[in-house]
Regions:
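Membrane-spanning helices that line or support transport/gating and their immediate boundary helices
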Residues: 17, 32, 64-71, 75, ...
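Helix-loop junctions and hydrophobic alpha-helical segments within the transmembrane domains
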Residues: 79-99
Length: 157
């Protein structure tokens, strides 16, 4: 509901919120699948650190999606005559550098902690790493195309 409120100036704010939630659920599904596979292969268990990692991944994913959607909102006002697909593509191209730089910086730190940190947090770091990979992917390649497809379908109807 926060995204609907934050994007209330754009047409159909519910679509922004629903697209962000779908992308976040994709990331949560990926890390639950990861922990299920590692549980079968290596005996990893769901514990408090896993839940902390899951919430952190959800936050990172949602924040990254909000940044892209905010740029779409800004460009909607800046380029009112541009068709929606072109505007969204422009917005993604303007934010992809920021998204990748932020996620790569976090991943470099996670790799360093994974290599040099203690064994007690390795599961946490591995889940965070997979979740950040998934979050970067889903905010750019799940949430945004879903939003565009929803808008195109509404225009066609």
């Amino acid at each position: 509901f926060y995204i609907m409120f934050a994007f209330r100036q754009v047409p159909h704010p519910f679509r922004y919120g629903a697209s962000a939630v779908v992308a976040m659920m994709h990331d949560i599904t990926i890390i639950f699948g990861f922990i299920a596979i590692t549980g079968l292969l290596f005996g990893w268990e769901v514990d408090a650190l896993f839940l902390t990692a899951a919430l952190t991944v959800a936050g990172f994913s949602l924040q990254d999606t909000i940044v892209v959607f905010d740029r779409i909102r800004e460009n909607t006002r800046r380029y009112p005559l541009e068709d929606y697909e072109t505007l969204v593509n422009r917005s993604v191209l303007e934010t992809v550098h920021r998204s990748l730089a932020t996620q790569l910086n976090a991943m470099f730190v996670l790799v360093a902690i994974l290599l040099f940190g203690g064994a007690s947090i390795r599961h946490f770091i591995a889940v965070l790493f997979i979740g950040l990979l998934s979050g970067t992917y889903s905010s750019l390649f799940n949430a945004v195309p879903l939003l565009v497809a929803w808008e195109k379908r509404a225009e066609a109807a």
